[in-house]
């Protein structure tokens, strides 16, 4: 009985350590979003014949916030963007931090609801107010996997990036904000 309890305890401890290692290797430490490692693995698994949506998201004015208020302000913005994405998209897909202020969202559940989800995201972003920075703006672009015949999931990501950069151009042109 004592041996069985010991063995059970040892197996459970090893399982928990393995789960923690997997979590750590796939999770961005700052935002708790999935990281680039998880993103690369998941991109390889996406089926181009199924309908899903790729959303490319980028913060506007992060450098300005870092330069004006310090890196704690920049981290606050990055974490806030991640929280807004998680709140809006997590039930329908996955949120990844793939670079400094670059995020990807892959919607696999009910992708036809993407405009509704984007509206929720816009609302979350508009209603956010931080400790160091008062407001946040983001640019994004999205692409349906079924828009045309794509060569790869990466081709879809590049198309979403292009739309996100168009959105970013519009933001800076309309707001008159400094691009730095």
Predicted regions and their residues:
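A short pre-motif secondary-structure segment
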Residues: 94-97
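Membrane-embedded alpha-helical segments, specifically the hydrophobic cores
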Residues: 1-12
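Active-site-proximal alpha-helical element of nucleotidyl cyclase-like catalytic domains
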Residues: 73-92
């Amino acid at each position: 009985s004592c041996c069985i309890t010991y063995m059970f305890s040892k197996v459970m401890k090893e399982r928990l350590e393995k789960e923690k290692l997997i979590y750590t290797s796939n999770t961005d430490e700052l935002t708790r979003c999935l990281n680039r490692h998880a993103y690369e693995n998941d991109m390889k698994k996406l089926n181009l014949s199924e309908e899903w949506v790729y959303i490319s998201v980028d913060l506007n004015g992060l450098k300005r916030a870092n330069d004006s208020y310090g890196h704690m302000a920049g981290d606050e913005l990055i974490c806030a963007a991640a929280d807004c994405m998680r709140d809006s998209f997590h039930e329908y897909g996955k949120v990844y931090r793939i670079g400094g202020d670059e995020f990807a969202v892959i919607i696999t559940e009910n992708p036809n609801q993407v405009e509704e989800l984007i509206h929720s995201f816009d609302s979350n972003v508009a209603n956010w107010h931080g400790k160091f920075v008062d407001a946040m703006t983001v640019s994004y672009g999205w692409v349906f996997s079924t828009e045309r015949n794509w060569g790869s999931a990466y081709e879809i990501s590049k198309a979403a990036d292009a739309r996100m950069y168009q959105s970013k151009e519009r933001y800076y042109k309309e707001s008159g904000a400094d691009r730095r």
